[in-house]
Amino acid sequence: MAELTIRPEEIRDALENFVQSYKPDAASREEVGTVTVAGDGIAKVEGLPSAMANELLKFEDGTLGLALNLEEREIGAVVLGEFSGIEEGQPVHRTGEVLSVAVGEGYLGRVVDPLGNPIDGLGEIETSGRRALELQAPTVMDRKSVHEPMETGYKAVDAMTPIGRGQRQLIIGDRQTGKTALAVDTIINQRDNWRTGDPKKQVRCIYVAIGQKGSTIASVRGALEEAGALEYTTIVAAPASDPAGFKYLAPYTGSAIGQQWMYEGKHVLIIFDDLSKQADAYRAVSLLLRRPPGREAYPGDVFYLHSRLLERCAKLSDDMGAGSMTGLPIVETKANDVSAFIPTNVISITDGQCFLESDLFNAGQRPALNVGISVSRVGGSAQHKAMRQVSGRLRVDLAQFRELEAFAAFGSDLDAASKSQLERGQRMVELLKQAQYQPMPTEDQVVSVWAGTTGKMDDVPVADIRRFEKELLEFLHRKYQGLMTSIKEGAKMSDDTLTAIADAIADFKKQFETSDGKLLGEDVPAAGK
């Protein structure tokens, strides 16, 4: 056997080759921390001195956590997912990434969790990139004033508190007053715009469900699917059974998905249902992380929680692509108290509010819109021109009717003018009622409101008002289609158009039969009665 000899030159050459081929970036330094406290959806971690605010941390079982509290010796993290497998002493790794969500057209028609993962069993989602959840809202110079209408399909809202694309309009009221129904109907009302295929008309919708029952979210999805509205809607679901961290993050996830479309020059409608539950979840997380409580035990930055979310809704300037994101945040009140902490915060952030009152709802007035304290601060300039023309006096007339109604309750004798105003008010209240999941096209709303405010329905019995309206609109679409199309196109109505509408209504009245068997304008019973 030959003797093994190693020459010094060979050792030197091998070392030189290794040193020359060494790449410093191939080596990595990883920080590993340790869980010191775990439970109730939060974890405290030691040993990660370089962690960033809002950085994702990875626990031993693969669950992610979000670094919220950066203290001198430890990090307070909220666990994003099931926390039962996280125990003291387990290692925690940094990911080097801040929280982000995948975005893209593939989200339309899907139900996802607050991390953007599909939960509807329809397979993976095709995405076009990722977007950070904590992004700066558009600056003042990036914005443009609101000037395009975002119709809800409700006469009461579109006539008296109009909403424009890029506006933030709060929907506020007690539980079970129709807040979600108003929001869902607004999504359904975008169906005709979507079917035009025109990107300038199409609206992509996002429904963020926070802290609701799973059955409620399923029923909303079913209603949208049945109405043909799911194809342009994304549902971000954080049901009541989810950890508080998911409920806190869900609105930001929906907003990030919507912002991507907005910056691509598209129009977006996002509904947060509801922000009261998000604030409750944030309060729970903050108290568990030992942050100092403030009013109603909410942390000091709860205003910033909602302001940085809602400021992302905007109408972008032409240079930025002219896209828009319209926000409809929902807030629940207790006993119609709009002066509580969260309601006043969100009212001060938004551009107006629709206040739905439980007394009106229980009296059969649906939508239960309280005209007195509902307002739209910027939507007037975006309102459909024909609607603005016919709805000018509607708010004042209804407010006067409510006062007169309260006065008449004392049984005082009223003069003829007051009686006439009271009777017309009763008809207008009846006219503004609408069934759920039946939004009305703009041209139908214009005719209906004009007929009511100008007294064209004064001779129709109150009990027949809704049937009269339904049959009148069917008659107009059948025999006066050109007239309805001209109203829809958005121009202010000329005197000739108004005369044509009045003639058409008079024409219809000749054949309308009231519930007591009379033809309008005649005192004799209809034939066969």
Curated annotation (Swiss-Prot):
Transport listed as a keyword: yes
MF annotations from Gene Ontology: ADP binding; ATP binding; proton-transporting ATP synthase activity, rotational mechanism
Coiled-coil segments: none
The keyword Hydrolase is annotated on this UniProt entry: no
Protein EC: 7.1.2.2
Places the protein is found: Cell membrane
Record keywords, A-Z: ATP synthesis, ATP-binding, Cell membrane, CF(1), Hydrogen ion transport, Ion transport, Membrane, Nucleotide-binding, Translocase, Transport
PROSITE patterns xref list: ATPASE_ALPHA_BETA (PS00152)
Complex formation: F-type ATPases have 2 components, CF(1) - the catalytic core - and CF(0) - the membrane proton channel. CF(1) has five subunits: alpha(3), beta(3), gamma(1), delta(1), epsilon(1). CF(0) has three main subunits: a(1), b(2) and c(9-12). The alpha and beta chains form an alternating ring which encloses part of the gamma chain. CF(1) is attached to CF(0) by a central stalk formed by the gamma and epsilon chains, while a peripheral stalk is formed by the delta and b chains.
Similarity comment text for this entry: Belongs to the ATPase alpha/beta chains family.
Function in brief: Produces ATP from ADP in the presence of a proton gradient across the membrane. The alpha chain is a regulatory subunit.
Name under which the protein is recorded: ATP synthase subunit alpha
Encoding gene per record: atpA
